[in-house]
């Protein structure tokens, strides 16, 4: 099975400020054995760094914790996808469903690979369900 993970779900693995997505552990456990594939646009790394930096600036993380979490994010079995070729499909999804281009890129990756989206963003999850990607 193929999965696409967004930043909202990924960050919860490391900073438990809410419930984990019910399928995230299964997806990563299966990806670690090669049974499943977890995908994301390259954008994921920048978004994850931005969220963690924001937490660092609010003193919710130390500088060392920030570094460790960034290394942990990079070490996960996630295949990063070029998102440049997906800009037009992502913009079409964003326009049709009232999403940001950022969120729509995750849907475009999921659509391209017939994958299921793992997100903790309720608005994005609702759209993913509506178009058969959740």
Ranges and model annotations:
Residues 12-14, 51, 127:
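Residues that scaffold the ATP/ADP-binding catalytic core of kinase and kinase-like folds
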Residues 50-57, 112:
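Short glycine/serine- and small hydrophobic-enriched flexible loop segments
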Residues 1-43, 55-68:
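Short, well-structured N-terminal submotif of metal-dependent ribonuclease cores
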Residues 42-45, 65-96:
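Acidic catalytic patch
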Residues 9-10, 44, 85-86, 106, ...:
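Alpha-helix capping/helix-boundary segments
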Residues 1-2, 107-134:
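Acidic, PIN/NYN-like endoribonuclease modules and their adjacent C-terminal/linker elements
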Residues 5, 39-40, 81, 101, ...:
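Short beta-strand scaffold positions
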């Amino acid at each position: 099975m193929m999965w696409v993970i967004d930043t909202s779900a990924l960050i919860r693995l490391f900073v438990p400020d809410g419930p984990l997505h019910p399928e995230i552990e299964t997806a990563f456990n299966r990806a670690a054995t090669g049974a499943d594939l977890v995908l994301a646009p390259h954008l994921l790394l920048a978004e994850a760094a931005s969220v963690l930096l924001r937490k660092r600036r609010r003193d919710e993380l130390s500088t060392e914790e920030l570094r460790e979490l960034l290394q942990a994010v990079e070490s996960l079995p996630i295949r990063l996808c070029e998102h440049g070729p997906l800009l037009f499909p992502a913009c079409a999804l964003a326009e049709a469903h009232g999403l940001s281009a950022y969120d729509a890129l995750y849907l475009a990756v999921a659509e391209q690979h017939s994958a299921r989206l793992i997100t903790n963003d309720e608005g994005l999850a609702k759209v993913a369900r509506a178009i058969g990607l959740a």
